[in-house]
Design a protein with these regions (language model features):
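Short, low-complexity N-terminal intrinsically disordered segments enriched in polar/charged residues
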Residues: 21-63, 67, 71, 173-178
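N-terminal signal peptide c-region/cleavage motif recognized by signal peptidases
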Residues: 16-18
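Short beta-strand edge/turn micro-motifs at domain boundaries
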Residues: 139-171
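Bacterial N-terminal signal peptides that target proteins for export
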Residues: 1-7
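Short beta-strand segments that buttress and anchor functional surface loops
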Residues: 121-130
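A solvent-exposed, acidic/Ser-Thr-rich amphipathic alpha-helical stretch
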Residues: 62-118, 133
């Protein structure tokens, strides 16, 4: 009887696991609508981060970094250096300038502002390195602190130290980052 119950439990769990498929995060239909706020300062901060991302980060127009970033910019991602000029030098090699899109290319879920902080939440599709056939979704965040001059002074994200130019454990699909 115990063997039958044990086999039944294994069968139920084996069948149930695929049925509990992850629901992918849903990107916002209208990114510009996410910039609205009753508080003008919060709306300005969200717009500043939105424009920085489109123009400098995705668009590769690092020549405009001073318009968006403080000189003493602090980077909390362990894979990138701090400092506006080191950011410019790094991304100048990575991203040639291209036309600026009207919206962020990454699939933005929401943009939230609180005081001097703006957080952008986005959907990312990743492949498990240990099981390459397993593709799943995560919700990523990028958080920025805006200083008294209205410039991006700090950036945080959940990135871990990359190995051989790749994130540990998973591979991001960066269709939007081209």
């Amino acid at each position: 009887m115990r063997t039958t119950a044990g086999l039944l439990a294994v069968f139920v769990l084996t069948v149930a696991v695929p049925a509990m498929a992850q629901v992918a995060p849903t990107p916002a239909a209208d990114q510009v609508a996410l910039l609205a706020s009753d508080n003008p300062r919060l709306a300005r901060n969200k717009r500043h981060v939105f424009d920085f991302w489109r123009i400098v980060y995705e668009g590769g127009h690092v020549d405009q970094a001073a318009k968006y970033m403080a000189e003493g910019y602090v980077q909390h991602n362990p894979n990138l250096p701090s400092g506006r000029q080191t950011f410019v030098d790094f991304f100048r090699k990575q991203r040639p300038p291209k036309p600026v899109a009207e919206r962020m290319k990454m699939p933005v879920i929401t943009i939230v502002a609180d005081g001097d902080y703006v957080s952008v939440f986005s959907a990312r599709k990743v492949r498990d390195r240990a099981n390459p056939s397993h593709v799943y979704y995560i919700t990523w965040f990028d958080m920025f602190r805006i200083d008294a001059q209205g410039l991006i002074a700090e950036h945080w994200d959940p990135s871990e130290m990359w190995v051989d130019g790749k994130p540990p454990g998973a591979e991001f699909f960066a269709e939007w980052d081209k």
